[in-house]
Amino acid sequence: MAFMRSHSNASSGMGVAPDIRDTFLELQMKKAFRYVIFKIEEKQKQVVVEKTGATTESYDDFLASLPENDCRYALYDFDFVTGENVQKSKIFFIAWSPSTSRIRAKMLYSTSKDRIKQELDGFHYEIQATDPTEVDLEVLRERAH
């Protein structure tokens, strides 16, 4: 019996587009992107890659990519230097669900979160955010150290 990754049902939320895992591996292993934004395409009944951010883009560029009134999932590759002067990188999974987004969108993203997280196995930290203060750069710094 073949298993289709993009298959979805009411209890598990949306399916996941086949290229999501490859995009994650490009961020994780090849450092091809600074961040990836994912959105739910209701007509396709799956989570898809909406945008990738170049490694030269800033954290402000990433935040500007999150819609003010709609939900998204995101990965952010956070580079930092430890107290011992060692360069490190941690990948954050962010479930962005602003309080101003539609209730239906919040429900769809909530029920689909576990499914996309299965495809993104290997991120270090998860943040659930409802407003910009919850994804401030300081929040990432504190979690990464």
Curated annotation (Swiss-Prot):
Respond yes or no to whether keyword Endoplasmic reticulum is given for this record. Answer: no
Pfam families associated with the record: Cofilin_ADF
Q: Name one GO cellular component term.
A: actin cytoskeleton
Alphabetical keyword list: Actin-binding
Q: Where is the ADF-H domain?
A: 13-145
Q: Which GO terms describe its biological process?
A: actin filament depolymerization
The lineage's top-level taxon is Eukaryota
Please give one Gene Ontology molecular function term for this protein: actin filament binding
Tell me yes or no: is Transferase among this UniProt entry's keywords. Answer: no
Check the record and name the PROSITE patterns matching this protein: ADF_H
Q: Which Gene3D superfamilies match?
A: Severin (3.40.20.10)
Tell me the protein family, please.
Belongs to the actin-binding proteins ADF family.
Q: What does this protein do?
A: Actin-depolymerizing protein. Severs actin filaments (F-actin) and binds to actin monomers.
Q: What is this protein called?
A: Actin-depolymerizing factor 2
Q: Which organism is it from?
A: Oryza sativa subsp. japonica (Rice)
Write the gene name: ADF2
